[in-house]
Amino acid sequence: VDIDGAVDMATTLAVAGNVDFNGDLDVDGTTNLDIVDVDGAVNFAADVTFADGADIITASAGDNNVRVGLTAGDSIADGGNQNTLIGDRAGTAITTGDQNIAIGFEALQTEDAGSRNTAVGSFSLQNLNVDGSTYNTALGYYSGNAITTGVQNTLIGGLSGDVLTDADFNVALGYKTLSADTQGSRSTAVGHEALMTQNFTTATDVFNTGVGFGAGNKITTGIRNTLIGSRSGDAFTDADYNVALGYNALTSDTLGSTSTAIGYSALETQNFTTATNSYNVAVGYTAGTAITTGIKNVVVGGLALDASNTGQENTAIGHQALTADTKGNRNVAVGAGTLVTQNFTTATSVYNVAVGYSTGNAITTGVQNTLIGGLAGDASQTGDANVAVGYLSFSSVATGDNNTAIGTRSMFSNTSGSENTGLGKDALYSNTVGAYNTAVGEGALYNNVDGSNSTAVGRLALYTQDPASAVNMYNVAVGYGAGQLVTTGTQNVLIGGLAGDSLNAANENVALGYSALTADLKGHRSVAIGTATLATQQFGTSTNTYNTAVGYFAGNDITTGVQNTLIGGLAGDALTDADYNVALGISSLGLDTKGNKSVAIGAETLTTQNFTTSTDTFNTAVGYAAGKAVTTGIYNTLIGGRAGDALTDADYNVAIGGAALTSDTLGSESVAVGTSALTAQNFTTATASYNVAVGSNAGAAVTTGIENVLIGGLAGDALTDADYNIAVGKAALT
């Protein structure tokens, strides 16, 4: 059908073929046409329905353009392609711009050569006019209305970004988001009225992000803020570098900068009315919610530090960590419930450190405590300057000060004891009021309750020490099990593995060396220095022993002997219940078991003396090998190297000088004073010689002569078997 004139249809028109109109077409009824070409106006009084797949094609100079609306896209020229323009005056100035979408009254109205813009909503991107690919997107009434030369902005929501001019790279989603800014770039506002008042009048890279109802809605010139959550940061004006994530996070602050608040109401009341770098970090439900002007706090965990208002430089990490404190400064609380009751009502530099579940959870006003480990120091209230490291360490302390507890359950029971150091599992476990103790090693000073001034280093050292009342113990035990059975003994020094490990009520002992004084129970005032020294000494009743043994195995076999002084390797190592002996030198008095009152000074002196029954020997031997062969002789005084070194069962001899009386075995009651005096005398049967020789080599050749008196150097030095001679003077009777 070809029609050149006007056609008015009052009823239905149905045509199976094509209809070409050169004039106008007015239709009041229904028109069903396969194809309609109209050169004039087409007016429909009723609805127009297009079949699926049908197109509206409007003529323009460019290609693939869609124009619907009064003067929509009516300036498109050759080169303006693939534009979709719907609405009166939508894209009406576009000439050569491509791939633009404008939907709405006067949307994208002034753009001519710009491309790839999307404007949906009345007056959206109305004033944009920039050549090139700008990639602006505006969706909503008046969104991006004032943008002239800005690029790559995404604005969604009524009045979103509606006064931006040449700003770039902004994202605004929500009613009136970014609705006051003119030249700020690189902001992201998502949510009703987010970043609503931000306004930069000069080109500025802002980098603000506001996501949530009213997020950052009072910011004017603040930059680089990230605010996510309804009302987050909604009081900020020109604050910078803040992060707020969560409902009401950082909702009161106006000029505080460099804060981080993540969580519901985190840092909710923080408010700096002058420009301040707060450096606060709060992460968790109501974390740091009461902070007003406190600075440099790090808060991570639900309810952490949520009562503090002006506290500074606190670190609280964990649920309810530091939850009650209001004005305390410089605390570190890491772990759920750490320092949960601490509360300083006036500004105080506290310096408490608590790390671990519920560590320090009873502290109220204690300061300078360091507590590390689950439940460490969890009963401490007002104690100061304590250190506790380990699960349940220092777990009962109420008021003790200046304690250090490191290790699981170390100082577990301490209540008021002060100045203690416990290092190791269960060290000082039972201590309550004891003070000035040092325990290093598992179970060291484990049972001590009231004792003070003890030092135990080594596993189980002083394990059972437990005086019945508060007593200054002054015990020192160093080594595995050293003094482990001491209960009420005091002033003992026990150093070495198992040193004094059986002592219980003994006092004032010194044991230094592995197994030194290891068997004694109640002996007092012994000194044992060296491996296994006095190792078998054992007094079952309280006894002042006054034994001193110094050297490897010195006095090793002594059981109940007292007042012995044994110095040197193996010195007196066979003595058992012998008393009042002195042995100084390796192996000196080394074989005797029950001889008493002997003095042996020098290597191998009296080395073979041996009394098997208790005997007062009164032997004195001083010098290398002096009296070396004496076995059961008594009352001998032998002084000098090898003096009387062949005597065996001889008695009452005096030999003073090197090699004096050096050959005799059974002669008794001789006196030889001087080098080599009576050096050859030798009685092979028990004989009272009554010889006296004084002087170098005096009587040097006498062998079996008796009752001679020879005084002077070389006096009678040639006599052999002569008797009853007296020679006085140098070389007399020579």
Per-segment meaning from a language model:
Residues 47-734:
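Glycine- and small/polar-enriched repetitive beta-structure motifs of secreted/surface proteins
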Residues 1-50:
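Fibrous stalk/shaft segments of extracellular and virion attachment machinery
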